[in-house]
């Protein structure tokens, strides 16, 4: 439905069907031409005062983080991610990409007048690259996993309540795309590769002026969390309307307000889950991955967190979050990721799997300098 602004503009211009025309009746190519000419006409009368006003917006301000520090992070990350092919993404993607794949509200995306949009999530663009490559592999009967990584500056238009968050920021992301081979083998193998990358990255950065201590690795499973919520009488729609991914502590507040307690820290899903809730793939993850990682990284902590609600409508299956101790004594969830159905949808093949994870470069450079 059109907003009050649309209704007011329609009334003032005397064009009653303005919104339906813009929303779908005009072809995208025609609307692109229309908007291009409109903005060209407007900017023809712009001057220095207009530039000064525009330059006050946080959207166009430069990052407050030293560029050399960001580049140092990127160099280290690319060195550690030597098993992943490094790609340089376009700063824009197809119109609707962030919403269709990432579930980002279109109002929170910087949409261009040329029927494209600025990246709001690097993993959606990487998913499209995986789709291209997996599509070609299918023609050639190829079955190799596609492993990609990138560093990307993103733009998100939503208001941020947390100090330190800005409309544009840099992330380093990894994706692994391949075929389900049964027995959760894809999830176990590639989740392990991603976790190892981040823990090794933190170690490497510790030698370069950063301080990451006792990283807490939390594994969750959306299927288990959905079952627990259902048993508590909470619908997914109610949860999705209340939880915002960029607001810290959202899960805790949502559950506390409803008097619901979900298992936040468990070690053995088969023994510790409530009766009637199947562990799905978590039991295999414990024996085939988590127990090995505990021996490999004795300074890190590992647990299953089934009280995590952020990402429940974003991921499909196993997801992870890593929160190292920062120099200020707090833990911040700097790494997030999980399994998605994006390549399965794009390739129209339910056996396709995509693991997408990322680390907040800019946030790390602010909070984790020694």
Located regions from the model:
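Positively charged, Gly/Ser-enriched RNA/tRNA-binding surfaces
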Residues: 64-94, 101, 113-210, 216-217, ...
């Amino acid at each position: 439905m059109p907003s009050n602004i649309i209704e007011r503009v329609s009334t003032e211009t005397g064009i009653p069907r303005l919104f339906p025309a813009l929303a779908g009746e005009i072809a995208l190519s025609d609307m692109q031409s229309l908007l291009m000419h409109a903005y060209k006409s407007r900017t023809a009368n712009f001057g220095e005062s207009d530039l000064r006003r525009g330059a006050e917006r946080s959207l166009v301000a430069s990052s407050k983080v030293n560029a050399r520090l960001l580049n140092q992070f990127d160099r280290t990350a690319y060195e550690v991610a030597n098993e992943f092919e490094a790609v340089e993404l376009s700063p824009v993607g197809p119109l609707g990409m962030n919403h269709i794949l990432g579930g980002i509200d279109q109002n929170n995306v910087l949409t261009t007048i040329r029927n494209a949009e600025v990246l709001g999530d690097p993993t959606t663009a990487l998913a499209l690259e995986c789709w291209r490559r997996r599509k070609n592999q299918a023609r050639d009967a190829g079955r190799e996993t596609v492993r990609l990584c990138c560093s990307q500056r993103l733009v998100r238009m939503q208001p941020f309540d947390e100090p330190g968050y800005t409309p544009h920021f840099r992330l380093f992301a990894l994706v692994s795309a391949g075929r389900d081979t049964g027995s959760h083998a894809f999830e176990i193998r590639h989740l392990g590769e991603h976790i190892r990358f981040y823990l090794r990255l933190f170690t490497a950065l510790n030698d370069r002026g950063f301080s990451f201590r006792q990283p807490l690795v939390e594994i969750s499973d959306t299927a288990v969390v959905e079952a627990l919520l259902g048993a508590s009488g909470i619908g997914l729609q109610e949860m999705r309307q209340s939880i915002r991914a960029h607001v810290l502590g959202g899960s805790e507040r949502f559950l506390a307000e409803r008097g619901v307690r979900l298992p936040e820290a468990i070690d053995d899903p088969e023994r510790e889950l409530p009766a009637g809730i199947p562990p799905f793939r978590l039991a295999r993850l414990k024996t085939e991955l988590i127990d090995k990682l505990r021996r490999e990284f004795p300074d890190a902590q590992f647990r299953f967190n089934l009280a995590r609600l952020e990402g429940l409508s974003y991921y499909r299956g196993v997801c992870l979050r890593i929160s190292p101790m920062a120099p200020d004594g707090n833990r911040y969830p700097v790494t997030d990721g999980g399994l998605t159905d994006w390549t399965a949808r794009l390739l129209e093949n339910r056996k396709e799997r995509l693991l997408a994870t990322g680390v907040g470069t800019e946030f790390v450079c602010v909070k984790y300098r020694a």
